[in-house]
Amino acid sequence: MSENIRVSEVSDILRQQLEGIETKVQLDEIGTVLQVSDGVVRIYGLRNAEANELLEFDNGIKAIVMNLEEDNVGAVLLGPTDKIKEGFTVKRTKRIASIRVGESMLGRVIDPLGEPLDGKGLIGGELYEMPLERKAPGVIYRQPVNQPLQTGLKAVDAMIPIGRGQRELIIGDRQTGKTSIAIDTIINQRSNYEAGDPVYCIYVAIGQKGSTVASIVNTLRQYGAMDYTIVVAATAGDPAALQYFAPFAGAAIGEYFRDTGRHALVVYDDLSKQAVSYREVSLILRRPSGREAYPGDIFYLHSRLLERAAKIINQEEVAREMNDLPESLKGKVKGGGSLTALPIIETQAGDVSAYIPTNVISITDGQIFLDTDLFNQGNRPAINVGISVSRVGGNAQIKAMKKVAGTLKIDQAQYRELEAFSKFSGDMDPVTALTIDKGQKNARLLVQPQYSPMPVEKQIAILYCGIHGLLRNVPLDKVEDFEAAFLNTLALDHQADVLDVLKTGVINDEVTKAIEETAAMVAKQYS
């Protein structure tokens, strides 16, 4: 049985089907690899490539554009060089190098592109695109540093106080405890996290051994610090480009918390290795070299990175107008946030006048200088008080600490001077002997074991004893025992009327009387 096929029906069906067809044409701008060597590729054909743009090869390896020349583009590889060959095709992503940031990153170990390294699977949750390179907030979007960032270290919080939004350099030879100061500071933020006012921490490991990074992560996990910490790792085995971009990734993550009205702390460990990796990349890209073969813009590299640390103005309508704000954050900006930076620099044989150390000293708001001799003598943290300084943190120090420890720095500097002279003279007048005795006991009080940060109220109480000579009758070798017994007694008998009052930044006659009575009572056991 044959059916009559009407032409009009066929044409209607064809018309309907043709109307539903979507013809999407994606145009990719592609180039060809001319040359590849030591982590750098030269590419022909990418006429419209932008500086810092992300490029992608067919095998998934990424590169970032760093040189724009007349007939080719120089890019740094973010993967193994041996996987890229001459003649490979590479395409533009039309995206500036960036990292996706969000709350779900907390507790994770990532690379500078935001890829997880801890084997715990992909990072989920809501993520925001943050550019690695970004202009620092302008002057009108900032406010002076006025809130303390407690490190939990008596020597730092008393003599070289750090404020939220400050950049404080930690500088010293290898194996002098630079990383320990940073890790102790991160661990000390646990109390803020538990109190509901967290300081989110980003630890950036640049050019370190993988085993060292793993050990640091284990330590942070052991002390419960990974709950509010992100570790960005570019180890010694990673390409130089990844080591160069790692601090920028850390800054971008910190800016996410800062711009959403929260507080963040970023540790760059260390910028000496970043400078070396930038020198390596620049020389292979044939950029002109300057002093110590570093490129001419090495100062600008560190200044533009560290200027991103800031205390943002507490006016939301002004903060929302911030310069160079990423699209992803528009509508989510809040005022009053801060990003504090603790860059670390390694010196050679204590030479702080070398090129990179002097650059970073001049950029930052102060430095904590660690001394090898002090470290070997057992004075840890091995801070050389004479040349360590905090240029803005004093404004952020709590009033009680300022009142108690105001003269400690100069007292300790004078003690070190007198101690050096006393080695040459046999007899000393009573005043000098008393100054040296007090200085020795204060120096012993400032010694603190690793991973045992102390709350600020306990610091004030014990330093009050040292500065006001309440340890006069305590033998030098019993100072640690006195400290432990004194703080235990204070916590048992005077938690509400002394420690809780000191925590608010207040010190009055009732508080000092209770401290003096407790110290006298405990000192009797050791005199």
Swiss-Prot record:
InterPro entries: ATP_synth_asu-like_sf, ATP_synth_asu_C, ATP_synth_asu_C_sf, ATP_synth_F1_a_nt-bd_dom, ATP_synth_F1_asu, ATPase_a/bsu_AS, ATPase_F1/V1/A1_a/bsu_N, ATPase_F1/V1/A1_a/bsu_N_sf. It is found in: Cell inner membrane. GO terms for cellular component: plasma membrane; proton-transporting ATP synthase complex. GO terms for molecular function: ADP binding; ATP binding; proton-transporting ATP synthase activity, rotational mechanism. It comes from the Bacteria. CDD domains: ATP-synt_F1_alpha_C (cd18113), ATP-synt_F1_alpha_N (cd18116), F1-ATPase_alpha_CD (cd01132). It is a peripheral membrane protein. Produces ATP from ADP in the presence of a proton gradient across the membrane. The alpha chain is a regulatory subunit. F-type ATPases have 2 components, CF(1) - the catalytic core - and CF(0) - the membrane proton channel. CF(1) has five subunits: alpha(3), beta(3), gamma(1), delta(1), epsilon(1). CF(0) has three main subunits: a(1), b(2) and c(9-12). The alpha and beta chains form an alternating ring which encloses part of the gamma chain. CF(1) is attached to CF(0) by a central stalk formed by the gamma and epsilon chains, while a peripheral stalk is formed by the delta and b chains. This is ATP synthase subunit alpha. It comes from Bacteroides fragilis (strain ATCC 25285 / DSM 2151 / CCUG 4856 / JCM 11019 / LMG 10263 / NCTC 9343 / Onslow / VPI 2553 / EN-2).
